[in-house]
């Protein structure tokens, strides 16, 4: 009964909140132009492709910039700045042929802009969270560790329209990986002149379908069509206004009133209501994403104990969370790699996954007792979450599950930017996370828990044997053997309770039926260059 009361309370509180919310009116669109009003959950912290790390940032940056490859409407890799490429027989050398293209200030985009960008992101002074992706380039890790000069990075520009990348190991998924913002070029001529100030409106120079017009924190990021873009003739939307919409119920009402054309999320347990009052707007779709709990194993002594981590994970009623609380198509997760990822051999899962919840609760209490906790000396933890309503409801369900095994958990809710700053600084005990695939390969998930990844291994999970398996997979040329090695690595991490998977996500976008070109895809990429808005 406690669980159903929690779900009912959540729905009732959301209804009250929705009734109290207002919202700004839709801004005027110049005559003859197409404008897109876009709810984007939170403000970007950075529009620099090499220092950004949030999904909300990548949405905007991905409309401003284009890498060697880019996303088709279905999320697959297609030519971007590169018109073609070929790989050597050993898979270690890739040659890319660049198109004639300009930056938004009219200067040509050259291969040297890419070389400069890759050296910049790997420079230890940049302190990029995503540098670990670019360490796939030859000597990338040594450069990022400060043990080799920037010139050692495996990227060369024989001429203005040829880029040669040399890799540390074969990577058949490289065209997918190169869509990621960490591999975007930056305008060398601007960054060298302005430094970090290059990202400000009036200074920002882009090579993608849009250019930056304004950025008002807490209000709006505005971009306009870039006439210098190589495919500008086929870009429909002239202006995009991105709004922070942390209050998803308020954003839902704004979409309903026509003030927003898109909001990138909605409250899961409101799906049936939305479908009733706004038919055709809700676009739930399975994506390559997992939400999970991260345990701070560096600073929190009890969480260094695998028995405690297992107890906390075993006690979570995943089916209640996905089927009763969320109810938008999420699936319970007993592994980290979600369904549908290419190049993988599925089968790894938490060893106790098939046990009924009651049995798991008994085991969890016993494990806590073995670790020295009791009713007189209960385990006390803080669960830190971002301020999204969805995440708070999840946290409350986990809190209740832990109470059932004698764990006293408090919830600390912070603004998204503050929460992630705390995660990066390891200023948390347990954190509620989610991870959307950066590219279609299991490494985008399993690599997060590698010891040398850095800040995004939020819990500082360290297991040399796990690292060794991932490194062996990197060097394995046989695709089947590589997939099996990655499966062994995931099973090892799950046996060690390196994190607690909770559910496999669905994208939950609200899209006005007047918006065309929005295609569901596993990576949840929806670049604005493919969208249009039908006039009434």
Residues covered by each model-derived region:
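N-terminal lobe/hinge region of extracytoplasmic solute-binding protein
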Residues: 39-89, 119, 203-206
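Alpha-helical secondary-structure segments
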Residues: 110-117, 160-166, 170, 208-209, ...
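Ligand-site clamp/hinge motif
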Residues: 195-201, 227-273, 399, 408-410
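Extracytoplasmic/peripheral linker and loop segments enriched in polar/acidic and small residues
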Residues: 21-23, 156, 322, 357, ...
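Gly/Pro-rich hinge or "lid" segments in bacterial periplasmic/extracellular proteins
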Residues: 146, 160-161, 167-235, 239, ...
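Surface-exposed binding/hinge segments that line
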Residues: 113-115, 122, 126-189
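Structural transition elements
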Residues: 332-370, 388-393
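Long beta-strand-rich cores associated with HINT superfamily self-processing modules
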Residues: 509-536
